[in-house]
């Protein structure tokens, strides 16, 4: 049996662009993708801490070191520049893989630079 677990998370990212006329997806600084192990075209879930919007899309690489977090296409209607978002990717794991699974979580600052890397989330933690 496979179970679905979070394997990567960009926490407290800030939207830098919203491009309604792009075909779709979310553009993410390639350094941030690498830090948490999200691959280009991988399915991601994006939640908006300002308005509660929650979408699923796929990641595309943005310029390294740019800090870009750009919602493209229809998603741009639910995310505004400056909104704080959480970007998560999931993996389907076997029971054997679950025993050793360690998600990668990057907590970002206001400029989308990595402030802290976490290997676990502790209940009731406020960052």
Curated annotation (Swiss-Prot):
The keyword Cytoplasm applies. One of its GO terms (cellular component) is cytosol. GO terms for molecular function: aspartate 1-decarboxylase activity. Its main location: cytoplasm. Its EC number is 4.1.1.11. The active site is at residues 25, 58. It comes from the Bacteria. Pathway: Cofactor biosynthesis; (R)-pantothenate biosynthesis; beta-alanine from L-aspartate: step 1/1. It is an enzyme of class 4 (lyase). Its cofactor is pyruvate. It catalyses: L-aspartate + H(+) = beta-alanine + CO2. InterPro entries: Asp_de-COase-like_dom_sf (IPR009010), Asp_decarbox (IPR003190). GO terms for biological process: alanine biosynthetic process; pantothenate biosynthetic process. Keywords: Autocatalytic cleavage, Cytoplasm, Decarboxylase, Lyase, Pantothenate biosynthesis, Pyruvate, Schiff base, Zymogen. Is synthesized initially as an inactive proenzyme, which is activated by self-cleavage at a specific serine bond to produce a beta-subunit with a hydroxyl group at its C-terminus and an alpha-subunit with a pyruvoyl group at its N-terminus. Substrate binds at residues 57, 73-75. SUPFAM superfamilies: ADC-like. The modification Pyruvic acid (Ser) is found at residue 25. It is found in: Cytoplasm. Binds 1 pyruvoyl group covalently per subunit. Catalyzes the pyruvoyl-dependent decarboxylation of aspartate to produce beta-alanine. Belongs to the PanD family. Heterooctamer of four alpha and four beta subunits. This is Aspartate 1-decarboxylase. It comes from Exiguobacterium sibiricum (strain DSM 17290 / CCUG 55495 / CIP 109462 / JCM 13490 / 255-15).
